[in-house]
């Protein structure tokens, strides 16, 4: 009788790499020796045998992968192992990612099923994997595969099969293909080359059956996939002729089946700029082997047209059975200067027109927009916030008056200290020329009214173009132009953050200033700057006036002539910058865009910005902190009204690429841009653009 021997069967549970058969990979490069304490990691464990004799040793390979930064050394041990089974603690040195652990099984281990927990620890981070262990009965034979290894094996031709039988001599050994005998090999170690070329494509289960004294001992099964079908490219992204690709996007190619990662090289994919210059890149294959990702080493340049050429993949990249790709595509996509945030935005279905859009970026870096739009009977104010994937409407349509036919228009937005949007607008009262102003604050679920703003409204008196900013101490500052039928002037109020009523700021009215019209307000620190267009009787011209804290006319004079719509912003040194349209007759045809800034004791010389466009209108300024300032406006270039954008670089306004238009067809004019800086100091722009049926809001961000 042979000595009492036990059978040990181990298999990995929950370790998917141990159950996926791909060709063995060469050792990857060692990790950067610079380590991060408590770095996160994962590991896989693969036993070298599935059965082992008692008193013997089971070798188990482990492979380490750092989640992000590389960590230090990793110590391995078994957690509370059963009696007779032990692993001497082993430390994987810093910088290494592979090791072979030796698990000893004592000769006296009691037969039965056990659960082992293998643990790796680096710093304070521990990860575990579970192994099942079965100790067999005395007298059992040990049957182990050598090749194929655990998991799935792929073949398109001859396949080498090798295995061992230990623990005594077998009277008969058979290789089973599913339930039938494939061959009865002899000799030890046992070896057989299976020619699969005559087999039908499909999946087969192979196992080894050894017989002795009427007892049958069977190996663990091996899954063999016979595959002679060439893989194909199922899909790819970005799509052919895609027009809105981000500078950080990768190219993803999906195949019809898993590919051999060892057949994939960086040279297999061609990636070039529009000028034909090769783009440095890296390539990787997904864990399931079906997705090839091409990642440029640096962000793509914008604007540009990128070419992707996969023809080198043909016959070079193969599936796990060795079948090569027979055809592969080439295509192009465009990386524009600007990317849309969602598509066209409209609150009302049908042939409606959105107007007066205003954009602000909240304290979490998310754009918020407000605009006016008619539902066919009443024009309301709408507010929406970008979620990161879509525009979410904030509450119901806003109107200060309930009566049918009211007309809400010209909203403005501010974001308060609690990151809540506050919106103001003017609205027709239905009493002659009368218009009133209204203010609402978003609570997170609904809109609440702010205290009444004490402006007179009658059949001939009304307020227009309300402006709202958040100043020092998180106070709200409101300004508008008040018209009385004969004249108009700037009015201003403050709502303290802890107050319940608006305080009249009584803005100064310089002598000879008549008929104030377009208005823009900006805040910085303790300063509030109010810019407005006004007829300057002393200079006999309509110019731009800028008030500092509602109390003094900066520079003692107005700027420009024939001034119309304008925009003001404040830089980090609390200097106001102002841009305005000069138009002798009609801005939509003869408007010219100018700018100036305050230089401590006087204004810089007003300078023309719109050198390459006509019919300029609706400027919008946004000043960066550590990033270039931005000026956007609506103008006509190449016979199309678009949004033009310039950036302050090297002490001058320089165009940021080509004019922007959301619609590709001609005859789709873009109006009224509103620009703000995002959390990274980069511009986000909203405007309205019309086609033959309606006008919608569009929002774009810089592609950076």
State each model region's role.
Residues 20-139:
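Long beta-sheet-rich domains in secretory-pathway and surface-associated proteins
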Residues 31-36, 41-49, 137-154, 227-245:
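Short, compositionally biased P/S/T/A/G/V-rich stretches that sit at domain boundaries
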Residues 79-89, 179-183, 241, 269, ...:
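Short, solvent-exposed loop/linker segments at beta-strand-coil boundaries, enriched for Pro/Gly
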Residues 93, 98, 138-228, 309:
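Long, low-complexity serine/threonine/glycine- and acidic-rich segments characteristic of extracellular
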Residues 104-111, 195-199, 299-301:
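Short, surface-exposed loop/turn segments at beta-strand-coil junctions that are enriched for proline
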Residues 134-138, 195, 222-231, 331-337, ...:
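Flexible, low-complexity linkers/stalks enriched in Thr/Pro that connect modular domains
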Residues 163, 336-704:
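Extracellular, repeat-based ectodomains that mediate carbohydrate processing or recognition
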Residues 247-284, 313-318:
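Short, surface-exposed alpha-helix to beta-strand junction/turn motifs within ectodomains of secreted
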């Amino acid at each position: 009788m042979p000595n009492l021997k036990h059978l040990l069967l181990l298999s990995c549970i929950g370790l998917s790499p141990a159950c996926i058969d791909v060709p063995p990979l060469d050792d990857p490069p060692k990790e950067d020796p610079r380590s991060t304490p408590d770095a996160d990691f994962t590991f896989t464990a693969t036993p070298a045998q599935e059965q082992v004799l008692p008193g013997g040793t089971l070798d188990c390979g482990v492979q380490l992968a750092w989640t992000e930064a590389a960590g230090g050394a990793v110590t391995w041990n078994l957690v509370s192992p059963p009696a007779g089974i032990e692993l001497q603690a082993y430390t994987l040195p810093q910088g290494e990612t592979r090791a072979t652990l030796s698990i000893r099984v004592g000769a006296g281990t009691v037969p039965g099923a056990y659960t082992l927990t293998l643990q790796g620890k680096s710093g304070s981070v521990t990860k575990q994997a579970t192994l099942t262990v079965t100790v067999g009965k005395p007298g059992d034979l040990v049957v182990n595969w050598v090749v194929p290894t655990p998991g799935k094996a792929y073949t398109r031709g001859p396949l080498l099969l090798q295995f061992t039988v230990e623990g005594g001599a077998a009277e008969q050994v058979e290789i089973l293909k599913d339930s039938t005998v494939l061959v009865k090999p002899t000799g030890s170690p046992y070896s057989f080359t299976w020619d699969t070329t005559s087999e039908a494509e499909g999946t087969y289960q192979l196992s080894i059956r050894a017989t002795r004294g009427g007892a049958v001992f069977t190996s663990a099964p091996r899954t063999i996939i016979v595959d002679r079908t060439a893989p194909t490219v199922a899909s790819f992204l970005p799509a052919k002729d895609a027009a809105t690709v981000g500078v950080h996007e990768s190219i993803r190619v999906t195949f019809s089946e898993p590919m051999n990662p060892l057949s994939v090289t960086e040279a297999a994919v061609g990636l070039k700029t529009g000028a034909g210059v090769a783009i440095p890149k890296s390539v990787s294959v997904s864990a399931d082997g079906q997705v090839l990702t091409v990642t440029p080493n640096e962000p793509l340049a914008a604007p540009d047209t990128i070419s992707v050429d996969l023809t080198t993949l043909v016959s070079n990249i193969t599936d796990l059975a060795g079948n090569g790709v027979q055809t592969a595509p080439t295509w192009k996509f465009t990386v524009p200067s600007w990317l849309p945030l969602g598509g066209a935005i409209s609150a009302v279905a049908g042939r409606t027109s959105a107007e007066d859009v205003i954009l602000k970026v909240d304290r979490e870096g998310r754009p918020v927009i407000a605009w006016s739009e008619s539902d066919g009977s009443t024009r309301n104010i709408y507010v929406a916030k970008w979620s990161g994937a879509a525009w979410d409407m904030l509450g119901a349509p806003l109107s200060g008056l309930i009566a049918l036919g009211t007309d809400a228009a010209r909203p403005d937005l501010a974001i308060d200290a609690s990151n809540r949007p506050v919106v103001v607008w003017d609205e027709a009262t239905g009493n002659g020329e009368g218009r009133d102003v209204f203010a609402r604050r978003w609570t997170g679920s609904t809109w609440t009214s702010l205290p009444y703003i004490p402006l007179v409204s009658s059949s001939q008196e009304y307020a227009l173009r309300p402006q709202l900013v958040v100043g020092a101490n998180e106070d709200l500052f409101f300004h508008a132009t008040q018209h009385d039928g004969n004249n108009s002037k700037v009015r201003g109020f403050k709502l303290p953050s802890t107050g319940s009523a608006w305080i009249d700021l009584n803005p100064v009215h310089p002598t000879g200033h008549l008929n104030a019209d377009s208005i823009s307000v900006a805040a910085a620190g303790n300063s509030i700057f109010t810019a407005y267009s006004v007829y300057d009787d002393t200079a006999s011209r309509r110019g731009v006036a800028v008030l500092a804290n509602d109390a003094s006319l900066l520079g003692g004079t107005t700027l420009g002539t024939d001034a119309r719509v304008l925009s003001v912003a404040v830089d980090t040194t609390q200097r106001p910058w102002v841009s305005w349209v000069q138009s002798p007759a009609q801005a939509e045809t003869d408007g010219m865009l100018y700018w100036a800034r305050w230089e401590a004791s006087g204004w810089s010389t007003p300078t023309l910005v719109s050198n390459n466009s006509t019919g300029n209108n609706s400027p919008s300024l946004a000043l960066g902190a550590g990033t270039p300032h931005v000026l956007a406006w609506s103008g006509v270039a190449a016979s199309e009204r678009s949004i033009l954008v310039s950036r302050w670089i090297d002490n001058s306004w320089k165009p940021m690429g080509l004019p922007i238009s959301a619609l590709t067809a001609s005859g789709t004019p873009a109006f009224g841009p509103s620009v703000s800086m995002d959390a990274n100091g980069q511009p986000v722009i909203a405007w309205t653009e019309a086609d033959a049926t309606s006008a919608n809001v569009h929002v774009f961000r810089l592609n950076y």
